[in-house]
UniProtKB/Swiss-Prot annotation:
This is Acetyl-coenzyme A carboxylase carboxyl transferase subunit alpha. Its EC number is 2.1.3.15. It comes from Sinorhizobium fredii (strain NBRC 101917 / NGR234). It comes from the Bacteria. Keywords: ATP-binding, Cytoplasm, Fatty acid biosynthesis, Fatty acid metabolism, Lipid biosynthesis, Lipid metabolism, Nucleotide-binding, Transferase.
Length: 317
């Protein structure tokens, strides 16, 4: 059962008819619906191609937030072996919104950091809907330090609406934790490959996203603030989020043209949630190619190039 977005009504109507026909055929073996099902499946493919070829920025935002979209732990299970997560910041607590640890990627040791949103009510609460607290960013710093110490390439997967803005998080130094994580991400002398797999929201995303190579999935978004947040600030009206999204340059195509990211990873027609295995496989290939390209560079060069990359972004935008 799919969770349909509001602009997917033509698809939901067609797939509803397909389910009815299959149910009818299952109840009465004398009824042959295969030809009609095949015809409707063709119409579904055509409808998805048409709809997804011209998504608006707000529609892409909805796809990036789709509840069935694969999250960090889905990628970790498929891309990495021997993934050993670290827990805690050695100061206050553990934060499950940030998953970080050591693993093997195609046989080679790596360090891995990502935000996890969860996929049901219980896990979403556990992972705080992917909005990290200060402890999460301090845990990320721990893993970055380990990667730097042992010369491990660092892979980061970004998927957050933003860092948690609660009073307790602010009291424990949320801004400092984000700044420290960003600083460490810029300073390590190992290759960093970053992929925005869903939402890339504000400093909560950039804290683990200052990679030598940064990629976005086709229907992911990346911005300094959510469309709702921008609408609330600009017009005091969060219901104008659609209008804000259209003016914020948040899509992968926009950010590639602005030089913020290095490449776009295609998604299956209908979004990553339609075929998680395919998009995870493509992501793995892109990461492997990027690490191979960066492998011949020394640590000082990697760090200098990364710093220059983000200085250029600041100057050019």
């Amino acid at each position: 059962m799919h969770n349909y977005l509001d602009f997917e009504k033509p698809i939901s109507d067609l797939e509803g008819k397909i389910l009815e026909l299959k149910k009818l055929a299952g109840e009465d073996e004398s009824v042959n619906t295969s030809d009609e099902v095949a015809r409707l499946e063709g119409r579904v493919r055509d409808a998805m191609m048409e709809i997804y070829s011209k998504l608006s920025p707000w529609q892409k935002t909805q796809v990036a937030r789709h509840p069935s979209r694969p999250h960090f732990l889905d990628y970790a299970a498929e891309l990495f072996t021997e993934f050993t997560p670290l827990a805690g910041d050695r100061n206050f607590a553990n934060d499950d919104a940030i998953q970080a640890g050591l693993a093997r990627f195609r046989g080679a040791p790596v360090a891995v950091i990502g935000q996890e949103k969860g996929n049901d009510t219980k896990s979403r609460i556990k992972h705080n809907f992917g909005s990290p607290r200060p402890e999460g960013y301090r845990k990320a710093v721990r893993v970055m330090e380990m990667a730097d110490r042992f010369g491990l390439p660092l892979i980061t997967l970004v998927d957050t609406a933003g860092a948690y803005p609660g009073v307790n998080a602010e009291e424990r130094g949320q801004a400092e934790a984000i700044a420290r994580s960003t600083e460490m991400c810029l300073n390590v002398k190992v290759p960093i490959v970053t992929v925005v797999i869903g939402e890339g929201g504000s400093g909560g995303a950039i804290a683990i996203a200052t990679g030598n190579r940064v990629y976005m999935l086709e229907h992911s978004i990346y911005s300094v603030i959510s469309p709702e947040g921008a609408a609330s600030i600009l017009w005091r009206d969060s219901t104008r989020a659609k209008e804000a999204a259209s003016n914020m340059k948040i899509t992968a195509e926009d950010l590639k043209s602005l030089g913020v990211i290095d490449g776009i990873i295609p998604e299956p027609v209908g979004g990553a949630h339609r075929d998680p295995q395919a998009v995870i496989g493509r992501t793995g290939t892109v990461i492997a190619d990027a690490l191979k390209e960066l492998s011949g560079r020394n640590g000082d060069e990697l760090r200098a190039d990364r710093r220059q990359k983000y200085l250029n972004i600041g100057r050019n935008l």
